[in-house]
Amino acid sequence: MAPAATAAAPRLLRAAMLLLLLVAAGRRAAGAPVVNELRCQCLQTLQGIHLKNIQSVKVTTPGPHCDQTEVIASLKTGQEVCLNPTAPMVKKIIDKMLNKASAN
């Protein structure tokens, strides 16, 4: 090899290793959860809905993703709606659904 080629080899190797590390770091970051996915699901809530339309209810307690309690009702039509957890009608719906689940 020529002296110039021998001197350039370590630089080329260093550049290739750096590129490999950057690609590996980029792929790892692509699989990490995005911060904006960790947010409240309910932007608007309903004060209530008729119990006969509800198939199931999911209550999400406050946590790092959202600082408020969320009540999400799955309707028999397949639609999901957010309910106001402090509304009296919603509290009754949750109680009835819990009693129904404990009876089964």
Swiss-Prot record:
One of its GO terms (biological process) is inflammatory response. Keywords: Cytokine, Disulfide bond, Growth factor, Inflammatory response, Secreted, Signal. Its main location: secreted. It is found in: Secreted. Disulfide bonds join 40-66, 42-82. Pfam families: IL8. Gene3D superfamilies: 2.40.50.40. Coiled coil: none annotated. Residues 1-30 form the signal peptide. One of its GO terms (cellular component) is extracellular space. The keyword Signal applies. CDD domains: Chemokine_CXC. One of its GO terms (molecular function) is chemokine activity. InterPro entries: Chemokine_b/g/d, Chemokine_CXC, Chemokine_CXC_CS, Chemokine_IL8-like_dom, CXC_Chemokine_domain, Interleukin_8-like_sf. Belongs to the intercrine alpha (chemokine CxC) family. This is Growth-regulated protein homolog beta. It comes from Bos taurus.
